[in-house]
Amino acid sequence: MLFIFPLSLPWRPSCWKESCSTGQRQAGRSREDSVTPPPSSPWPTPPAGAMSTKQEARRDEGEARTRGQEAQLRDRAHLSQQRRLKQATQFLHKDSADLLPLDSLKRLGTSKDLQPRSVIQRRLVEGNPNWLQGEPPRMQDLIHGQESRRKTSRTEIPALLVNCKCQDQLLRVAVDTGTQYNRISAGCLSRLGLEKRVLKASAGDLAPGPPTQVEQLELQLGQETVVCSAQVVDAESPEFCLGLQTLLSLKCCIDLEHGVLRLKAPFSELPFLPLYQEPGQ
C-alpha cells in the first residue's frame, strides 16, 4: 500500500492576489478588444470655438451683401427720381416762350420772331456785334434777314376782334376789357378824315405825339350806332379798341363758347374774327 501524504507548503496570499489581478486585467483587455471602435472621420474635428467663428463670418458676409444690395437699390431709385424730375422740367414744346427763363420775356402770340431760339440769337448778336465776323457770308445774310423781318413784322393784336363801320368804312374793332377808354390809331383817324374832331393837347403839355382825344365818333356795331370818344394812340394795330366803359354802357356779353359779342336786346350779335388776322383781310 502506498500512502501519499500532502506536503505542507507555506501560505502565500500575495501570489494569489497577483494572479487574480492579472486574470482580471486580461479579462478586461479581452472585453475592450471585443468592442468595435467607431469609424474615424477623414477630416479632423475642429474645435467648438472655430465653428462659431466661421458661422459669425458667414453671417457678417451675408449682412454686408444685403446692405450692398439695399444701397444699390437706393442709388437706382435716386437716379430714377432725378431723371423723372429732369424730364418734368424739360420744355413741353420747343417754342414755349413762357417757359424760357429769360428776363422780361412774355408769351406774345405765335410770331416766329418771338420764339426762344430767335430771342437768344438776337440777344447774342446785340450783345456782341463782332460775333458774325467769322461766320460765312450766307449765315450773315440769313441772320440779318431775320433781324430785318423782325423790325418790319406786324404788332401783335388782341384776339377778340369784331367788324364795325365808321364813316361808311369797315373797321376791325378789338374788344379789350383791360382798357377803360376807347382808343383809335393815328393812321385810322387820318384814313377816316376825322382830324378836325380831335381835341388838341393843352398848351402846357409838351409831350410829343399825336393829339390826345377825338370826340363825337359814330361807330356802328351791327344795328346799333354808338356815339363815343376815343383816345388817339401811335400804334397802328388794332385800328380801334372798345374799352370797358363803352362795353358796360352797351351791356355787352362776351360769349366765348359761341364766339360772339352779344349786345343788349333787341340788337344782333357780332361774331369774333379769326385770331391774329392781318390788316386788310
UniProtKB/Swiss-Prot annotation:
Chain segments carrying region Disordered: 18-85
Organism domain of life: Eukaryota
Bias (Basic and acidic residues) ranges: 55-78
Claim: Coiled coil is one of the keywords in the record: no
Broad class of the protein's primary localization: nucleus
Disulfide bonds: none
Pro residues bias: start-end ranges: 36-47
Signal peptide: none
Any one GO BP annotation for this protein: proteolysis
GO cellular component assignments: cytoplasm; nucleus
Subcellular location as annotated: Nucleus
GO molecular function, one term: aspartic-type endopeptidase activity
KW Transcription regulation (keyword) present: yes
UniProt entry keywords in alphabetical sequence: Nucleus, Transcription, Transcription regulation
Motif (LXXLL motif): 244-248
The protein's role, per its UniProt record: Down-regulates transcriptional activation by nuclear receptors such as NR1F2.
Subunit structure: Interacts with NR1F2, RARA and THRB in a ligand-dependent manner.
Name of this chain's protein: Nuclear receptor-interacting protein 2
Organism: Homo sapiens (Human)
Lineage, uppermost ranks: Eukaryota, Metazoa, Chordata, Craniata, Vertebrata
